[in-house]
């Protein structure tokens, strides 16, 4: 979606899809994309408990990452569910494709991603998210345990599958799975240890 929003030839692409495939594409705005992701994940939010009253929804796509900052509210008569209110959303030009284009492979002698490359990527992503983070004090709230983080789409489900050591995607085991930061770190470390043959 973001690729079509940013592309110089986005309108020509939509016209070509219509002409060749008889499909009318609609490129939606970033805030509508965030709202649709929110609806798709609505059953995943735990009811707010104490100070844990916020959620960060992130969707790492092919052309961008959508981030949505949410306030969680109790649902009358449903103590284990949360109602969500969008506080803010942003579409960041950061994803697997854009990072690969910007940083390349950065492999060491063994064909693994170098620690230097990984550090550069992390710094770049932090820079892209800094204004959104500062505007809402998200890092502080995450450190205080006040935030649920919900990820959606292929990158997140793939990372979950890596952590679970699945030979192939298994929706029943992946969808709705909760991971701790240490578990995400374990999956990251596993991926960083792979070479191009793996």
Question: What kind of region is each of these model predictions?
Answer:
Residues 63-64:
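Active-site-adjacent helix-turn-beta-strand microarchitecture at beta-sheet edges
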Residues 2-55, 69-71, 76-80, 85-198:
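Helical "lid/coupling" subdomains associated with nucleotide-phosphate turnover
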């Amino acid at each position: 979606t973001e690729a079509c929003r940013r592309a110089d030839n986005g309108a020509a692409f939509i016209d070509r899809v219509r002409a060749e495939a008889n499909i009318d594409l609609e490129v939606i705005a970033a805030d509508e994309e965030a709202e649709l992701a929110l609806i798709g994940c609505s059953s995943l939010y735990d009811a707010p408990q104490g100070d844990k009253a916020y959620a960060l929804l992130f969707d790492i796509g092919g052309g961008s990452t959508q981030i949505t900052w949410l306030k969680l509210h109790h649902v009358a008569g449903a103590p284990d569910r949360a109602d969500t209110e969008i506080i803010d959303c942003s579409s960041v030009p950061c994803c697997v494709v854009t990072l690969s284009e910007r940083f390349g492979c950065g492999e060491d002698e063994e064909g693994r991603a170098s620690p230097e490359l990984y550090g550069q990527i992390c710094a770049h992503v932090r820079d892209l998210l800094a204004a959104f983070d500062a505007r809402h004090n998200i890092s502080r709230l995450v450190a205080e345990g006040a935030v649920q983080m919900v990820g959606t789409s292929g990158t997140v489900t793939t990372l979950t599958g890596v952590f679970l050591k699945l030979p192939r995607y298994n929706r029943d085991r992946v969808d709705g799975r909760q991971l701790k930061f240490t578990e995400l770190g374990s999956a990251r470390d596993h991926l960083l240890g792979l070479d191009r043959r793996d």
